[in-house]
């Protein structure tokens, strides 16, 4: 990737959060999306995100990175045509989503350097080591209970919600800031909770995902 990014012109702000400023822009003559990351201790850095996207691009699961600059904490992505403003999650959408998540979870991730979900939680612990906030402490207790034997880890997005899903003929996911090794049920539970799927919709998702999970634990992971 380039060390000096081609001049970009910002068209409008898409989202500003505690972890990034995301803008619709022109990259040269190409419509694109720019992300300027803030320094946040438990999100993937620019180098890790570039590595993740390169891997996922071969699976058609993410947008292509056009340019990046680690020193500026900036990444330029291709602009995705499609929608992430879906109202009705019909059978076709849920089937494609389940298959996309299955493809993600079956991917070999041993060559990806992103921290695991457990490592990110341990960073939280260090930051809040002296905290007596009951909500924070309850979160750590829940994590320890659910992850008492973290085997069968897969590569997870770890932040799947409606705004991170782009849908045209295929499903692509954006915002891989929290991605890393985790229990597969975490992604599934995140989808069910964030999309507010009912029992029938959940069955369609799980049938298309088609990897055995202990569905009785899904509610516990809807954090």
Where are the language model's segments positioned?
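Active-site activation/catalytic loop segments of kinase-like enzymes and analogous catalytic loops
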Residues: 185-213, 223
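ATP-binding glycine-rich phosphate-binding loop
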Residues: 3-27
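ATP-binding pocket architecture of kinase catalytic cores
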Residues: 18-115
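Active-site acidic catalytic loop and adjacent metal/ATP-binding pocket
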Residues: 18, 22-25, 143-186
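A short linear hydrophobic-aromatic micro-motif
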Residues: 9-12, 62-66, 215-218
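Structured catalytic cores of enzymes that bind and process phosphorylated ligands/cofactors
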Residues: 64-66, 104-124, 153-156, 165, ...
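An alpha-helical support segment within catalytic cores of ATP-dependent transferases
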Residues: 1-2, 109-158, 207
